Amino acid sequence: DVSRIVRSYPGVSFSPIGYRNDLIVRGGSPSENRFYMDGIEIPNINHFATQGASGGPVSIVNADLIREITFYTGAFPANRSGALSSVLDFQLKDGNPDKQAFKATIGASEVSLSGAGHLGQRTTYLFSARQSYLQLLFKALGLPFLPNFIDGQFKTKTRFNEHSELTLLGLAGIDKMKLNTDEKGEDAEYLLSYLPTIHQETFTLGASYRHYNGRHVQSLILSHNYLNNRNLKYRNNDDSSEDNLTLRLRSTEQKTTLRFENQTRLGAWTLKEGAELNNSIYTNHSRQRPVSYTHLR
């Protein structure tokens, strides 16, 4: 998990909640960090993330696909706008131009499949997909909540000639948490009394066109991010009737970005200039009913 690794750097502290990997840089908020992958902004890199924060228990990004990471805690590059605490910049590997290679892995909590290769002479690809079986482990351990996640990512790079290339990139994560109402006992019943069911989806799709012209490098980047978060809670966890509904939350965040960058090398100096357009849409629908309890003596 990359987020847990960079927590050992100076000025970086960790969340007091042990299972989360929030980055708290120089006293800033976890929501003040920015993440980029091959120049494309990624709003969320963790499963079961909390809106308004950047952390979660499990990373969406497959570390096997990462070639290089640059972590900024200050002096942010001009083309990495909007960050107040830190910037975590991922560079993914390219696909294999010579052969097709695939890898299957069975881990302690998930199974995964990844691959790298080429599509013709000009295009390479890289992909990864994971499916967890945490819900089976949690049920076997007798826990009252059953989390599950799926994620996937891909990258293709097409080299038109020695001066221009096009990169397509995608990242997706789906999180679900159900309740194990079969569990009995005081602790389990207490957790089941307030924990909601969770369904969360996050998607990022982007394209980056890059042109090399001597000392100049021009980039045109188009990306779209989407986050959907739904929580439901029923009285006594009985979803047979809408009358039992005590909490319904649906929140979505969407952001479309178009960015142009020009980079010029002037001896030991690098000059960067560009422009960026953003279109953001936020919606929130919530419904909550008060729940009354009667204590009998």
What are these regions (language model features)?
Residues T50-G55, F71-Y72, N96-D98, L136-A140, ...:
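Extracytoplasmic loops and strand-loop junctions of Gram-negative outer membrane beta-barrel proteins
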Residues D1-F76, V87-K93:
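Periplasmic N-terminal accessory/gating domains of Gram-negative outer-membrane beta-barrel systems
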Residues K157-D175, P196-R297:
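Face-selective signature of the C-terminal outer-membrane beta-barrel domain
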Residues P16-I17, A63, R80, T105-G107, ...:
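Short sequence motifs at beta-strands and strand-loop junctions characteristic
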Residues D1, R20, G56, I66, ...:
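Transmembrane beta-barrel architecture of outer-membrane proteins
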Residues N46-T50, L136-L141, N180-D182, L232-Y234, ...:
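Short acidic, glycine/proline-rich loop/turn micro-motifs
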Residues R34, E68-N79, S85-K93, Q100-P144, ...:
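Predominantly transmembrane beta-strands of Gram-negative outer membrane beta-barrel pores used
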